[in-house]
Amino acid sequence: MTLRTFVSALGVILALILTAVAVPTAWIDQNIVKEEGFVRIAGELGNDPEFQDRLATAAVGTFESSVDLPGPIQSLAADALRSAASGMQSWSDYPQAWEETVRNSHRLNFGAANQPEEAATTTALVLDISPLVRLIRDHFAEATRIRIDVPAESLVSLGEPSHRQLVERVAAFAPLWWVAALGALISMLLALVAARRRSLVLVFLGLGGLALAALWTAGADLAGGVVGSLSSANGVAELFKQEFLTAAKAGFGEWILMAAVASGGVFVAGVIASVVSGRRGSRSASS
């Protein structure tokens, strides 16, 4: 094996290893750590009837526990709250309240600078349903003409205190995906420059990319199983975790599909280039 072949092979291996790290880390940064991506994924839970029913019940319970109504209007309030628990999702201002819920929750979990002490010490993840509680308050005020103050924050626990360390590590390291991506690009260019037959480099990069797509798929299933097995604080937390994992796996699956298609294209290009260069070599040898 010549030095050029060794350097080229090393470049291919490094490019694949760094790509294996860069792609899932970039996805996590764009879709979990960054607020807009998190809102896009978690926002889909707003269309899940079972989850929203449980969330509405939790919001109504929080509202009931935060107010002290006079006896004469308690029966009227009970009817209004039952209506809220069963029909909140049909309110025109519900989607906006749910999006605000998701945004507030992301800031509490990933914007660690100004987190309240309760969120920092009791659980790794919390869902701030105060926008939904305020929504119930506003509709309750319309029905009863009674305006009631509610807590600024209404937190639903989504995990255990030990889970926060994982969240903090993800938030700290995921934004550094570009370092691995840059290293993969440099390694790939080094492999192409050092190679005697660049077409073979493309072939191996394509095959490696297809293998990585399979590895990412298996890794996503494994990670989903591990996270899914973690204990949840309550029924709302368990349902949120399962539905969010399903949405996240589907989102990452789209990236895997694009990577597989790109890798297949690189592989085909390498095969074609290898065939063409082989024919040229045969012609020059015969002449």
Model-derived features: where do they sit?
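Acidic, carboxylate-rich catalytic segments that either coordinate divalent cations
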Residues: 254-277
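Cytosolic/nucleoplasmic, non-transmembrane interface domains of endomembrane
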Residues: 9-184
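Membrane-helix interfacial "entry" motifs
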Residues: 1, 5, 46, 167, ...
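Terminal targeting segments of Actinobacterial cell-envelope proteins
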Residues: 1-2, 154-170, 236-240, 244, ...
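Membrane-helix exit/juxtamembrane interface segments
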Residues: 24-47, 200-203, 214-232
